[in-house]
Amino acid sequence: MSIATINPATGETVKTFTPTTQDEVEDAIARAYARFDNYRHTTFTQRAKWANATADLLEAEANQSAALMTLEMGKTLQSAKDEAMKCAKGFRYYAEKAETLLADEPAEAAAVGASKALARYQPLGVVLAVMPWNFPLWQTVRFAAPALMAGNVGLLKHASNVPQCALYLADVIARGGFPEDCFQTLLISANGVEAILRDPRVAAATLTGSEPAGQAVGAIAGNEIKPTVLELGGSDPFIVMPSADLDAAVATAVTGRVQNNGQSCIAAKRFIAHADIYDEFVEKFVARMETLRVGDPTDPDTDVGPLATESGRAQVEQQVDAAAAAGAVIRCGGKRPDRPGWFYPPTVITDITKDMALYTDEVFGPVASVYCATNIDDAIEIANATPFGLGSNAWTQNESEQRHFIDNIVAGQVFINGMTVSYPELPFGGIKRSGYGRELSTHGIREFCNIKTVWIA
């Protein structure tokens, strides 16, 4: 795959980039490994100063970085600005909390025959980050901020269609004051990942991306006995019960499905409405989806921009067309507009049966599948009928139902009466084929630490 900026709103190639050579990759690994030897001994106070300075730059340059994101992968300018500001928040969170989150944990010394016993968190070393295009800054920052604050150093292999975002990340972290070579961007294809991950100087890896990419990286890391965090796909359920505030649920359902032009791993994708309110939910949901404006992502009036890649749109088209051919009903959308760029309209599909691929598959675009549940257990059965287990939403005012959803939905996250969102303060990740490990919060910063037992007689 070429490394290039291709404007998804027009399909035009804006700029191409020379890939990082094998010699340059070797040099980057060597420099990262050498840097870790002294960077690990910097203090939390020093790292916090650099992290806060990086946050200042991210805030000050939000308009510029937003323009890069919109140009390279098509998200609306406002959502791109929001992403840049969220990155600043992530750096500030770990600047403030890292020392506390990684403080020594005393154990009961007498119980283990010691005068002193504790668990200590120490950085692992060079961590390879393989990151996707859909949140080109935030996906990387939610690795970089905790990893750097823990004393690790990073090598970034970003998606090949967001090279300018990838280069900006390394640049802004360097300008924030982090020592040279603490965080480096490598412009390489997926084929170059294996050699880096097998290098003994690389201690661990984190990947956000597709299931096949996660399988490949997980297999290599397993062979090398190296820790990994995998955040893969999702086909999140959004359940609406009779006691829900229906208008609020519908409004959130629309936002949850079309955020980031429908290209979010934690977007609500499968909407499950109780039979008592199913018809009303579908009517209101379709009506709101039909009002959304598809267009130029730089236009402030645009609700939904283009999909990021031509192949991505082709995949969405194939999934929708296959469902329709099998008997599913397209309530709105379903046909690409006749215009340049990789646009696809907000689409709602009903009457999906278990034998259709759409019943379990993830659709990475603004396409909503709607199902009717006869009761709460039926809703949970539909929700869990997927190989994925990333996020989930349930809308009900009934506290017993809320507890039932929390206990029985098989996912890494359950949001009640709200939209699934990643926060620096909360652990983020999934189970089943959505991956393993956690990003963000206490759990995220400890993923790439050696938990060292200390025992003193």
Swiss-Prot record:
Biological processes annotated in GO: tricarboxylic acid cycle
Domain of life: Bacteria
Positions annotated to bind NADP(+): W133, N134, K157, H158, A159, S160, G209, S210, L232, E362
CDD domains to which the protein is assigned, alphabetical: ALDH_SSADH1_GabD1 (cd07100)
Catalyses which reaction(s): succinate semialdehyde + NADP(+) + H2O = succinate + NADPH + 2 H(+)
Top-level EC class: oxidoreductase
Location of the active site: E231 (proton acceptor), C265 (nucleophile)
UniProt keyword annotations, A-Z: NADP, Oxidoreductase, Tricarboxylic acid cycle
Gene3D superfamilies given in the database record: Aldehyde Dehydrogenase, Chain A, domain 1 (3.40.605.10), Aldehyde Dehydrogenase, Chain A, domain 2 (3.40.309.10)
Record-listed E.C. numbers: 1.2.1.79
A molecular-function term among this protein's GO annotations: aldehyde dehydrogenase [NAD(P)+] activity
Similarity section: Belongs to the aldehyde dehydrogenase family.
Its job: Catalyzes the NADP(+)-dependent oxidation of succinate semialdehyde to succinate. It is believed to be the main source of succinate semialdehyde dehydrogenase activity in Mycobacterium.
NCBIfam families from the UniProt entry: PRK09406.1
Protein name: Succinate-semialdehyde dehydrogenase [NADP(+)]
Originating species: Mycobacterium leprae (strain TN)
